[in-house]
């Protein structure tokens, strides 16, 4: 694991003949993500003013081959042993198998025992095809000293982030956007707010890839690679991972074999995700996903420690269930209870770590459980991705409920929406009629919706009706034409909710605490098995993740297997009606200088209505409040979070 930063200087650019100025700037910017890798840090450069070149910055969190796999990593064939230079964030879990294959087929020689050299040797011998062979989470930048090209890539699902900015001075890539913002004078990119991205954020509660809220900074999308040269105006980006859900029927003759296939691929994935030279723990909520991962992990580490979090308020904690699950599988368990005071105090620090606003309150308890876990372990496993791959969200059952509408003539179906409009809000059947009148492409755009069209117009002075969710989702839906509706919803979530919310908080919030989070469900081999499941093996009228539950019967304790999903719930609705969080909310709105972007009076009205109980605006308010806090930190600079730099033992 590490935080990486790479700068490809334009020819005759501002870097100077020796690259010393650029190296100094890169070192300063890299320190802003020290938390991603407190074990080692440094820079490396090969720049001359005439032809440009490259500068690397890195912060290493050493997990595998602690003693030898220092960054940047150098490797090459015998005739050019230092041809390639790599900075790498992530882990390659099948690196042992890849190294053996490269030795056997190509005679590759390795100088370390780590996973990074598998990327370098694989790239040399297989080219970009190496990306199809990697089982892991990764974002990396690889400099070829012969072609003078920077090759960057991200893992298929977007577990690890990579931001890109291009300007007159060259192109920079980084694990964290704040590092690029620190390099704006060196690179020379546009730092104005992207109003389209802001509207997308308000609709979705996160900024969808490849956008960011700064016009000059984009994200390399999940499953893509980029080629960057000093003599090019912009990176050349190519998608290498194109997910497909191609269902294969389950029959009475093969059903158990299909469930066994799921069990086997999960066992293999967890076994590989346990590869580390440090202690590995696990996050444990009250659900089947994290419990399954922990139950499989303890086979490889009988002293497994599990961690969970909750709140003091009744109904907002799964600690009791997690404790029972830990006891059932024989794991030691540690719980962190978060108070309202702690919650409020941590918000500026958390938003600074996030880089982009993510209006998901669950990332706050995640921050505290990650901080607690880091006292005991350096790596944790977690259950993210199971819902998207195996059909775990309740909304995936909606096509079953709306199936009768599919038989209506289109004009009649549309009229159902008009019938629903005059019905009172909250009236039984209103939402069903409205959503039934819409096509899947119109009604479903991931697991986030809080503002109606009218409400968006109220809070965004620059609202534009053409900047809707459809300009984010339409290209994705175009790829899934002809699939069953559940598969299409899963596919949308891979490109929206999963990589825009779930994996952003999973990466940023754990790395804020120098803790590596691994997600065994998001493995290419697991996806290959899950993608062949038919809709009926995922969703029924009574349950979700049907096939996964069947596959986990021998692994997950019975009290968890069919329990309703809760996750890490947060009592935002209650806390925004009284107490410290409400006071903080009024103060945040009152001091905000984002009035040209957000209608401050409209947000005040929502706060007042929510406080007195006439409306539940909690999700809408949280979306606005997190943006205002983000704006105060990164644009106004009126809020300066206190960022600690704790010293952790390298070996743990």
Swiss-Prot record:
Pathway: Amino-acid biosynthesis; L-asparagine biosynthesis; L-asparagine from L-aspartate (L-Gln route): step 1/1
Entry's Gene Ontology cellular component terms: cytosol; extracellular region; plasma membrane
UniProt GO BP: L-asparagine biosynthetic process
Chain ranges of the Glutamine amidotransferase type-2 domain: 2-231
Enzyme class: ligase
Keywords: Amino-acid biosynthesis, Asparagine biosynthesis, ATP-binding, Glutamine amidotransferase, Ligase, Nucleotide-binding
Active site (record annotation): 2 (for gatase activity)
PROSITE patterns the record matches: GATASE_TYPE_2
Residues binding ATP: 382-383
InterPro entries: Asn_synth_AEB (IPR006426), Asn_synthase (IPR001962), ASN_synthetase/amidase (IPR051786), AsnB_N (IPR033738), GATase_2_dom (IPR017932), Ntn_hydrolases_N (IPR029055), Rossmann-like_a/b/a_fold (IPR014729)
Catalytic activity: L-aspartate + L-glutamine + ATP + H2O = L-asparagine + L-glutamate + AMP + diphosphate + H(+)
Protein known as: Putative asparagine synthetase [glutamine-hydrolyzing]
Organism, scientific name: Mycobacterium tuberculosis (strain ATCC 25618 / H37Rv)
